[in-house]
Amino acid sequence: RDCLLSRGLGDVYKRQVHLFNAMPAFTHREPGVVGAVSDSEHVMAEIICDGVHIHPSMVRAAFKMMGANRMIFISDSMRATGLEDGEYTLGGQPVVVKGNLATLHDGTIAGSATNLMDCLRYVVKKAGISLETAVMCATENPAKEIGIYDKVGSISVGKQADFVLIDDELNIKRVYIDGKEIIC
Protein backbone atom coordinates (compact mmCIF):
# COMPACT_ATOMS: atom_id res chain seq x y z
CA ARG A 1 0.00 0.00 0.00
CA ASP A 2 2.71 2.50 0.94
CA CYS A 3 4.83 1.42 -2.00
CA LEU A 4 1.90 2.22 -4.28
CA LEU A 5 1.42 5.55 -2.54
CA SER A 6 5.07 6.40 -3.04
CA ARG A 7 4.99 5.47 -6.71
CA GLY A 8 1.66 7.21 -7.10
CA LEU A 9 3.04 10.63 -6.19
CA GLY A 10 4.77 10.75 -9.56
CA ASP A 11 4.80 14.21 -11.08
CA VAL A 12 1.20 14.95 -10.10
CA TYR A 13 1.75 16.04 -6.51
CA LYS A 14 4.09 18.95 -5.85
CA ARG A 15 3.43 19.88 -2.22
CA GLN A 16 2.42 18.12 0.97
CA VAL A 17 0.78 20.20 3.71
CA HIS A 18 1.06 19.82 7.48
CA LEU A 19 3.78 17.16 7.45
CA PHE A 20 3.27 14.63 10.30
CA ASN A 21 -0.16 16.06 11.23
CA ALA A 22 -3.48 14.24 10.76
CA MET A 23 -1.78 11.29 9.08
CA PRO A 24 -0.66 7.81 10.11
CA ALA A 25 2.64 7.59 11.95
CA PHE A 26 5.84 7.11 9.95
CA THR A 27 7.06 3.57 10.69
CA HIS A 28 9.54 1.15 9.14
CA ARG A 29 6.81 -1.21 7.88
CA GLU A 30 4.23 1.34 6.79
CA PRO A 31 5.95 4.65 6.03
CA GLY A 32 2.68 6.22 4.87
CA VAL A 33 2.49 9.77 3.59
CA VAL A 34 5.72 10.86 5.29
CA GLY A 35 7.62 8.04 3.58
CA ALA A 36 6.05 8.79 0.22
CA VAL A 37 6.90 12.48 0.47
CA SER A 38 10.48 11.84 1.58
CA ASP A 39 10.84 9.38 -1.31
CA SER A 40 9.56 11.85 -3.91
CA GLU A 41 12.34 14.37 -4.49
CA HIS A 42 10.13 16.83 -6.39
CA VAL A 43 7.57 17.17 -3.57
CA MET A 44 7.87 20.11 -1.16
CA ALA A 45 6.88 19.54 2.47
CA GLU A 46 5.06 22.19 4.49
CA ILE A 47 5.71 21.84 8.21
CA ILE A 48 4.01 23.64 11.10
CA CYS A 49 6.81 24.89 13.35
CA ASP A 50 4.85 26.40 16.21
CA GLY A 51 6.20 24.24 19.04
CA VAL A 52 2.86 22.48 19.46
CA HIS A 53 2.23 20.49 16.31
CA ILE A 54 5.66 18.87 15.94
CA HIS A 55 8.41 17.95 18.40
CA PRO A 56 11.82 19.55 17.69
CA SER A 57 13.39 16.14 16.97
CA MET A 58 10.81 15.52 14.24
CA VAL A 59 11.61 18.90 12.69
CA ARG A 60 15.27 17.83 12.56
CA ALA A 61 14.28 14.41 11.19
CA ALA A 62 12.27 16.03 8.40
CA PHE A 63 15.30 18.11 7.42
CA LYS A 64 17.48 15.00 7.34
CA MET A 65 14.97 13.05 5.26
CA MET A 66 14.06 15.77 2.79
CA GLY A 67 16.75 18.41 2.89
CA ALA A 68 16.30 22.13 3.50
CA ASN A 69 15.54 22.90 -0.14
CA ARG A 70 12.29 20.90 0.11
CA MET A 71 11.03 22.34 3.40
CA ILE A 72 8.48 25.16 3.72
CA PHE A 73 7.70 26.61 7.14
CA ILE A 74 4.08 27.48 7.79
CA SER A 75 2.35 28.76 10.91
CA ASP A 76 -1.13 27.20 10.55
CA SER A 77 -2.13 30.47 12.14
CA MET A 78 -5.75 31.42 12.66
CA ARG A 79 -7.31 34.85 13.00
CA ALA A 80 -6.98 34.83 16.80
CA THR A 81 -3.19 34.97 16.52
CA GLY A 82 -1.88 37.81 18.66
CA LEU A 83 -5.15 38.19 20.56
CA GLU A 84 -5.95 37.35 24.16
CA ASP A 85 -6.65 33.79 25.24
CA GLY A 86 -10.32 32.99 24.86
CA GLU A 87 -13.01 31.55 22.62
CA TYR A 88 -13.02 32.22 18.88
CA THR A 89 -14.32 30.53 15.76
CA LEU A 90 -12.45 28.72 13.03
CA GLY A 91 -14.34 27.58 9.98
CA GLY A 92 -17.59 28.05 11.84
CA GLN A 93 -16.48 25.87 14.76
CA PRO A 94 -15.87 27.22 18.25
CA VAL A 95 -12.24 26.97 19.33
CA VAL A 96 -10.40 27.77 22.53
CA VAL A 97 -7.13 29.65 22.21
CA LYS A 98 -4.62 29.40 25.03
CA GLY A 99 -1.16 30.73 24.31
CA ASN A 100 -0.23 29.62 20.83
CA LEU A 101 -2.59 26.64 20.76
CA ALA A 102 -6.12 26.52 19.33
CA THR A 103 -8.25 23.50 20.25
CA LEU A 104 -11.78 22.29 19.78
CA HIS A 105 -13.75 21.89 23.01
CA ASP A 106 -12.83 18.18 23.11
CA GLY A 107 -9.11 19.09 23.16
CA THR A 108 -8.36 18.24 19.52
CA ILE A 109 -5.79 20.60 18.01
CA ALA A 110 -7.66 22.92 15.66
CA GLY A 111 -4.79 25.12 14.57
CA SER A 112 -2.19 27.50 15.83
CA ALA A 113 -2.15 31.01 17.17
CA THR A 114 1.52 31.49 16.32
CA ASN A 115 2.87 33.91 13.72
CA LEU A 116 5.58 32.88 11.28
CA MET A 117 8.29 34.91 13.03
CA ASP A 118 7.65 32.97 16.25
CA CYS A 119 7.81 29.74 14.22
CA LEU A 120 11.19 30.81 12.86
CA ARG A 121 12.43 31.56 16.39
CA TYR A 122 11.23 28.13 17.52
CA VAL A 123 13.10 26.16 14.85
CA VAL A 124 16.29 28.13 15.42
CA LYS A 125 16.24 28.09 19.24
CA LYS A 126 14.55 24.73 19.97
CA ALA A 127 15.15 22.55 16.91
CA GLY A 128 18.66 23.84 16.20
CA ILE A 129 18.08 24.78 12.57
CA SER A 130 20.47 27.52 11.45
CA LEU A 131 19.02 31.01 11.05
CA GLU A 132 20.06 31.10 7.39
CA THR A 133 18.28 27.80 6.67
CA ALA A 134 15.20 28.80 8.65
CA VAL A 135 14.89 32.08 6.75
CA MET A 136 15.20 30.21 3.45
CA CYS A 137 12.40 27.81 4.47
CA ALA A 138 10.13 30.68 5.52
CA THR A 139 10.78 32.95 2.53
CA GLU A 140 12.69 31.66 -0.48
CA ASN A 141 11.29 28.13 -0.67
CA PRO A 142 7.60 29.11 -0.50
CA ALA A 143 8.12 31.95 -2.99
CA LYS A 144 9.75 29.55 -5.44
CA GLU A 145 7.04 26.94 -4.88
CA ILE A 146 4.18 29.28 -5.76
CA GLY A 147 6.01 30.92 -8.63
CA ILE A 148 6.62 34.41 -7.25
CA TYR A 149 10.34 34.21 -6.49
CA ASP A 150 11.03 36.78 -9.20
CA LYS A 151 9.13 39.30 -7.01
CA VAL A 152 9.65 38.20 -3.38
CA GLY A 153 11.45 35.63 -1.26
CA SER A 154 14.87 37.24 -1.15
CA ILE A 155 16.42 40.67 -1.02
CA SER A 156 17.59 41.42 -4.54
CA VAL A 157 17.60 44.35 -6.95
CA GLY A 158 14.23 44.66 -8.65
CA LYS A 159 12.32 42.65 -6.06
CA GLN A 160 9.68 43.93 -3.67
CA ALA A 161 11.56 44.92 -0.53
CA ASP A 162 9.48 43.37 2.26
CA PHE A 163 11.71 42.30 5.14
CA VAL A 164 12.40 42.54 8.85
CA LEU A 165 15.59 43.45 10.67
CA ILE A 166 16.24 41.34 13.75
CA ASP A 167 18.78 41.37 16.54
CA ASP A 168 20.93 38.48 17.80
CA GLU A 169 18.04 37.24 19.97
CA LEU A 170 15.73 37.19 16.91
CA ASN A 171 13.67 40.12 18.12
CA ILE A 172 12.20 42.28 15.38
CA LYS A 173 13.82 45.71 15.33
CA ARG A 174 12.45 47.16 12.08
CA VAL A 175 9.89 46.19 9.46
CA TYR A 176 9.99 47.25 5.82
CA ILE A 177 7.19 46.90 3.29
CA ASP A 178 7.93 47.79 -0.30
CA GLY A 179 11.23 49.29 0.86
CA LYS A 180 9.60 51.68 3.32
CA GLU A 181 10.00 51.32 7.07
CA ILE A 182 6.72 50.94 8.90
CA ILE A 183 6.11 51.60 12.57
CA CYS A 184 4.83 48.58 14.49
Language-model features, listed with the residues they occupy:
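His/Asp/Glu-enriched, well-ordered alpha-helical/loop segment
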Residues: 29-47, 51, 58, 63-75, ...
